[in-house]
């Protein structure tokens, strides 16, 4: 009879995923929750009550890929109807508030470029983090549909998208550092050596976490899925290596934009995958008799994650600032665009606001994705982070960020009128720390409970307690102004 460890490993192995359409529909519940929160709080300067906040942003997300995975439209309706009803009941006050909001937002007269916090970006990042933290435990229960778990090699799934989205989000955040460096005087700018040292130091913490996870997995009989990253590799190690590796190409980005480098990395890698079957044969079938062979998935997929990270930086160039800057569609610029008459056609085309920039990049990456499939119909592979996977992740995230930004436009939210629910703000402030806590919590639950043997009722109770625990921890850290930077 198989051991519990072997049964759990078999439970997450050999999976083929589901459709991209279903993944889009399921994850749209986070967007629906953000819309509902704005409907409920539209006539009030205070945030929505914590109980409603938790139901919308944690419980609804959990239900979307468990109990309501087959009835996602019903769940969406259950969220929307009460929210719209509340909004309509307070219509007169909402109308008055709308006029006040317009007056408030038209007073923006800041001419200097500054980095600002955008409600839609906080909502997007927090929603993605919540989904990721919930899914890493839920996947170990029978209540979590197997089509949402990570695929073995080829295909798309909810969790495969979550991994890439996490890297993409980190890329957006990292572009803040590029802006800060641009805004410094020449004498205050860090040297290349200092940048490399700082990037290595920031990655060291994550590397220690990755090695710690490896130690506990190997010594506590925790289930392993070797084809995910390899024998010794894990996602924390990938995250730890991104900053020090990508800081090495910073000097190049002065001449070649991040988006071009991202495409170059993906294209060259993809050509190796499709032109010569020997590489693909090695990746899929080779023995794991050396360190490189044992961890080939983690090593080879790093190219794809570098590309995703660079795409995230590109998006950050036009969504993080308070003003449109020249050529911000593709480069880090702090030059505020003012004189429209004297701008060249190229400057006019590549100087964009958040919504337009997101729309442009969505169209471009979607067209590239479709064109690539026509040239060579290799499907998505998160295991190898191939070009179809990279373009899928970028296309999805730009589309959803665009939808979030449109919600902000609809309700008059901006950096000057920053309105976001407390639990989303709390999650955003300690995102990486909460991801670590969720990983540790998942391990503890798995060691204490045979998750694979629990029925649906017990499973959902455990997952709700887990969700409440994570929400409480993030809220407590936020309330006490504890911001953990890893």
Swiss-Prot record:
<keyword id="KW-0472">Membrane</keyword>
<feature type="transmembrane region" description="Helical">
    <location>
        <begin position="254"/>
        <end position="274"/>
    </location>
</feature>
<feature type="glycosylation site" description="N-linked (GlcNAc...) asparagine">
    <location>
        <position position="413"/>
    </location>
</feature>
<dbReference type="GO" id="GO:0006506">
    <property type="term" value="P:GPI anchor biosynthetic process"/>
</dbReference>
<feature type="transmembrane region" description="Helical">
    <location>
        <begin position="432"/>
        <end position="452"/>
    </location>
</feature>
<feature type="transmembrane region" description="Helical">
    <location>
        <begin position="153"/>
        <end position="173"/>
    </location>
</feature>
<feature type="transmembrane region" description="Helical">
    <location>
        <begin position="119"/>
        <end position="139"/>
    </location>
</feature>
<keyword id="KW-0256">Endoplasmic reticulum</keyword>
<keyword id="KW-1133">Transmembrane helix</keyword>
<comment type="similarity">
    <text>Belongs to the PIGW family.</text>
</comment>
<feature type="transmembrane region" description="Helical">
    <location>
        <begin position="48"/>
        <end position="68"/>
    </location>
</feature>
<dbReference type="GO" id="GO:0032216">
    <property type="term" value="F:glucosaminyl-phosphatidylinositol O-acyltransferase activity"/>
</dbReference>
<feature type="transmembrane region" description="Helical">
    <location>
        <begin position="458"/>
        <end position="478"/>
    </location>
</feature>
<feature type="transmembrane region" description="Helical">
    <location>
        <begin position="355"/>
        <end position="375"/>
    </location>
</feature>
<comment type="function">
    <text>Probable acetyltransferase, which acetylates the inositol ring of phosphatidylinositol during biosynthesis of GPI-anchor.</text>
</comment>
<feature type="glycosylation site" description="N-linked (GlcNAc...) asparagine">
    <location>
        <position position="43"/>
    </location>
</feature>
<dbReference type="GO" id="GO:0005789">
    <property type="term" value="C:endoplasmic reticulum membrane"/>
</dbReference>
<keyword id="KW-0012">Acyltransferase</keyword>
<keyword id="KW-0808">Transferase</keyword>
<keyword id="KW-0325">Glycoprotein</keyword>
<feature type="transmembrane region" description="Helical">
    <location>
        <begin position="299"/>
        <end position="319"/>
    </location>
</feature>
<feature type="transmembrane region" description="Helical">
    <location>
        <begin position="229"/>
        <end position="249"/>
    </location>
</feature>
<feature type="glycosylation site" description="N-linked (GlcNAc...) asparagine">
    <location>
        <position position="342"/>
    </location>
</feature>
<feature type="transmembrane region" description="Helical">
    <location>
        <begin position="71"/>
        <end position="91"/>
    </location>
</feature>
<dbReference type="InterPro" id="IPR009447">
    <property type="entry name" value="PIGW/GWT1"/>
</dbReference>
<keyword id="KW-0337">GPI-anchor biosynthesis</keyword>
<keyword id="KW-0812">Transmembrane</keyword>
<dbReference type="Pfam" id="PF06423">
    <property type="entry name" value="GWT1"/>
</dbReference>
<dbReference type="GO" id="GO:0072659">
    <property type="term" value="P:protein localization to plasma membrane"/>
</dbReference>
<protein>
    <recommendedName>
        <fullName>GPI-anchored wall transfer protein 1</fullName>
        <ecNumber>2.3.-.-</ecNumber>
    </recommendedName>
</protein>
<feature type="transmembrane region" description="Helical">
    <location>
        <begin position="197"/>
        <end position="216"/>
    </location>
</feature>
<feature type="transmembrane region" description="Helical">
    <location>
        <begin position="387"/>
        <end position="407"/>
    </location>
</feature>
<feature type="transmembrane region" description="Helical">
    <location>
        <begin position="20"/>
        <end position="42"/>
    </location>
</feature>
<comment type="pathway">
    <text>Glycolipid biosynthesis; glycosylphosphatidylinositol-anchor biosynthesis.</text>
</comment>
């Amino acid at each position: 009879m198989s051991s519990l460890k072997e049964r759990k490993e078999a439970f997450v192995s050999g999976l083929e995923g589901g459709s991209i359409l279903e993944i889009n529909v399921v994850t749209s519940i986070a967007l629906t929750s953000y819309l509902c929160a704005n409907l409920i709080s539209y006539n009030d300067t205070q945030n929505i009550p914590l109980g409603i906040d938790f139901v919308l942003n944690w419980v609804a997300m959990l239900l979307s890929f468990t109990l309501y995975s087959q009835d996602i439209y019903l769940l969406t309706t259950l969220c929307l109807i009460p929210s719209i009803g509340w909004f309509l009941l307070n219509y007169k006050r909402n109308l008055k508030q709308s006029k006040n909001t317009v007056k408030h937002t038209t007073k923006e007269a800041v001419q200097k470029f500054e980095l600002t916090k955008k409600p839609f970006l906080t909502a997007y990042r927090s929603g993605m983090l919540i989904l990721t933290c919930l899914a890493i435990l839920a996947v170990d229960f029978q209540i979590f549909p197997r089509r949402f778990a990570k695929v073995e090699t080829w295909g798309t799934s909810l969790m495969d998208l979550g991994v890439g989205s996490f890297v993409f989000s980190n890329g957006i955040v990292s572009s803040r550092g590029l802006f800060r460096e641009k805004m410094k005087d020449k004498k205050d700018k860090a040297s290349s050596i200092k940048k490399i040292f700082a990037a290595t130091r920031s990655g060291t913490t994550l590397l220690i976490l990755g090695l710690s996870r490896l130690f506990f997995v190997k010594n506590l009989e925790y289930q392993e899925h070797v084809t995910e990253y390899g024998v010794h590799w894990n996602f924390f190690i990938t995250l730890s290596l991104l900053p020090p590796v990508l800081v090495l190409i910073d000097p190049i980005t002065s001449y070649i934009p991040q988006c071009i480098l991202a495409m170059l990395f993906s294209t060259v890698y993809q050509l190796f995958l499709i032109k010569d079957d020997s590489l693909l044969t090695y990746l899929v079938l080779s023995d794991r008799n050396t360190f490189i062979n044992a961890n080939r998935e983690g090593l080879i997929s790093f190219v794809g994650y570098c590309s995703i990270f660079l795409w995230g930086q590109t998006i950050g160039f036009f969504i993080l600032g308070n003003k449109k800057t020249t050529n911000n569609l593709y480069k880090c610029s702090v030059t505020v665009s003012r004189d429209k008459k004297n701008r060249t056609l190229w400057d006019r085309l590549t100087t964009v606001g958040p919504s337009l920039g997101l729309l442009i990049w969505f169209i471009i990456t979607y067209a590239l994705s479709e064109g690539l499939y026509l040239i060579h119909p290799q499907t998505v592979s998160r295991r190898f982070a191939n070009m179809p996977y990279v373009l899928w992740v970028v296309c999805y995230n730009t589309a959803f960020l665009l939808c979030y930004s449109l919600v902000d436009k609809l309700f008059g939210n901006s950096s000057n009128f920053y309105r976001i629910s407390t639990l989303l703000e709390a999650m955003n402030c300690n995102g990486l720390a909460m991801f670590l806590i969720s990983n540790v919590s998942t391990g503890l639950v798995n060691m204490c409970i045979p998750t694979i043997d629990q029925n649906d009722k017990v499973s959902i109770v455990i997952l709700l307690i887990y969700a409440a625990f994570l929400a409480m921890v993030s809220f407590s850290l936020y309330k006490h102004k504890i911001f953990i930077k890893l």
